[in-house]
């Protein structure tokens, strides 16, 4: 009797667990997702020896596959010897937007430990806010980017975003995947996934996703973001035609609470054990949210016009173009106004700020390499940018076209590497300029000394020029001055002992919001 009851209970439990069958369409959908994730495991990117004969001229490094094989870049000499019998970690390459190449690093070091966070970067010289992934306050103003177009100007939240230079292109002899996972404060997780494979020795794709959600220690402080990125690069068999494509979409949501109220500040400073639980502390409001949506697309193609069998003696000329579109949508919404920010503007019942920014760039460039001048690239760039406050009719939108010219020169003088770049605006009221120069000299015992200078002039951002908040006290229209930075830097590096750097920076008209 007991066995019959146990059998009956097991059957009943089994019927409850499988009382509803999974629909066929849902099974097929799950199967498609499973096959998509497993696809890189079955892809083999093996380099076959090129055919020989009179129809294919012999070239130097014929059996090597390099992301810049026709670029002849003396300062970027990493290459892949893609033979099945000899594959090492140095054959897995990461190519930056500037076509600098490094190999994938799988070592476990202290530097990797400090990068084990939601930003996947070392937070040295940054002060993080209380919640994981919320924002980082910079303690140093050393970081800069080679950009002359004006940005939207919300610098306080910039650390949450995936910036263009943080994602590059790949070349791998076998499929490569990278997984990051970490729990966050109170409740939530942070993850970063990258899958890349060479479908063909000259065709690569990479797809990555970064997700983050953290509840935080205080009330109404949830931080979350979802960032998807994709890149692909192709080079035809003779190395003349090259294509690069990059797509990046991101969505960031951050609850805002205005900080602790006066009573909670006193409770916090008292050190009472009761308030070690930060959720007991009251905040100024619990009804505001910041939302950011960003989309970025980059398409780049070039073609080698002049070439020869001997790439070390004959100049090579390459022509190309690059198109980029960057769209940002910033929104701040609040269910009820907070008296600490003042009164609302006329005819408004609750705060809602919406700023839209778009930047479109088109570059036409040429790359010349020769034993005499080294590597030189020149370009002319067309900027088309707009800034609009979607819900406000007080200030008109800003739309402007601007042009700039620039170039980059790389040359090796014996053991000394020299690199210089510049871009100068030739039209447009808000376009900036920059000049950069750097030398690198190997020293004794694998030590390397790097020194240089940089100068930059850039618009601080459209939000400093005009902004119409729902709060009447946060509305302005100005004519901001250009932000100017001058820096001199030096760095002593060693592959085992690390880096020691010194930078002195002088900044005029610095703006922060």
PLM feature spans:
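Exposed, low-structure sequence patches enriched in small/polar residues
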Residues: 48, 147, 172-174, 291-334, ...
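Sec-dependent signal peptide cleavage junction
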Residues: 45-115
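Flexible loop and strand-edge segments within Gram-negative outer membrane beta-barrel domains
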Residues: 239-300, 328-338, 347, 355, ...
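Outer-membrane beta-barrel proteins
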Residues: 77, 90-94, 101, 182, ...
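Short strand-turn segments of transmembrane beta-barrel domains in outer membranes
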Residues: 150-152, 163-169, 173-195, 216-217
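Bacterial Sec-dependent N-terminal signal peptides
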Residues: 1-53, 374
């Amino acid at each position: 009797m007991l066995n019959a009851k146990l059998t009956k209970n097991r059957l009943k439990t089994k019927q409850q667990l499988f009382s509803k069958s999974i629909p066929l369409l849902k099974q097929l959908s799950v199967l498609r997702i499973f096959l998509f994730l497993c696809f890189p495991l079955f892809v083999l990117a093996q380099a076959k020896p090129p055919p020989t004969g009179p129809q294919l001229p012999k070239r130097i490094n014929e059996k090597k596959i390099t992301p810049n094989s026709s670029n002849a870049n003396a300062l970027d000499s990493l290459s892949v010897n893609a033979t099945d019998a000899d594959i090492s970690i140095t054959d897995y390459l990461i190519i930056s937007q500037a076509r600098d190449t490094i190999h994938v690093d799988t070592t476990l070091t202290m530097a990797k430990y400090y990068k084990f966070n939601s930003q996947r970067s070392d937070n040295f010289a940054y002060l993080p806010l209380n919640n994981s992934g919320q924002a980082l306050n910079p303690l140093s103003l050393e970081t800069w980017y080679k950009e002359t177009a004006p940005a939207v100007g919300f610098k306080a939240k910039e650390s949450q975003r995936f910036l263009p230079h943080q994602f590059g292109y790949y070349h791998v002899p076998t499929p490569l995947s990278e997984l990051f996972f970490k729990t966050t404060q109170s409740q939530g997780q942070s993850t970063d996934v990258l899958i890349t494979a060479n479908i063909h020795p000259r065709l690569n794709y990479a797809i990555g996703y970064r997700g983050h959600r953290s509840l935080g220690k205080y009330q109404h402080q949830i931080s979350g973001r979802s960032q998807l990125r994709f890149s692909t690069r192709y080079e035809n068999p003779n190395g003349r035609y090259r294509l690069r494509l990059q797509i990046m979409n991101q969505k960031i949501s951050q609850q805002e609470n205005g900080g602790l109220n006066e009573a909670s500040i006193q409770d916090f400073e008292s050190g009472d054990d009761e308030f070690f639980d930060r959720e007991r502390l009251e905040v100024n409001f619990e009804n505001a949210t910041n939302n950011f949506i960003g989309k970025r697309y980059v398409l780049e193609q070039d073609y080698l016009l002049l070439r020869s069998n001997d790439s070390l003696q004959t100049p090579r000329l390459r022509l190309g173009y690059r198109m980029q579109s960057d769209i940002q949508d910033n929104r701040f919404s609040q269910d009820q106004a907070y008296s600490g920010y003042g009164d609302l503007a006329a005819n408004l019942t609750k705060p809602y700020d919406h700023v839209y920014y778009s930047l479109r760039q088109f570059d036409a460039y040429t790359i010349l390499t020769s034993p005499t001048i080294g590597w030189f690239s020149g370009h002319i760039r067309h900027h088309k940018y707009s800034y609009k406050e979607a819900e406000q009719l007080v200030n008109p939108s800003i739309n402007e076209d601007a042009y700039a010219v620039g170039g980059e020169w790389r040359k090796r003088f014996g053991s000394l590497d020299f690199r210089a770049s510049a871009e100068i605006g030739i039209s447009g009221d808000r376009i900036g300029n920059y000049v950069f120069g750097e030398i690198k000299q190997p020293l004794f015992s694998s030590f390397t000394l790097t020194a240089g200078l940089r100068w930059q002039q850039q618009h601080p951002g459209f939000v400093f020029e005009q902004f119409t908040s729902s709060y009447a006290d946060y509305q302005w229209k100005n004519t901001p001055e250009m932000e100017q930075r001058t820096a001199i830097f030096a760095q002593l590096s060693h592959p085992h002992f690390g880096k020691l750097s010194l930078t002195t920076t002088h900044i005029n008209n610095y703006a922060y919001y």
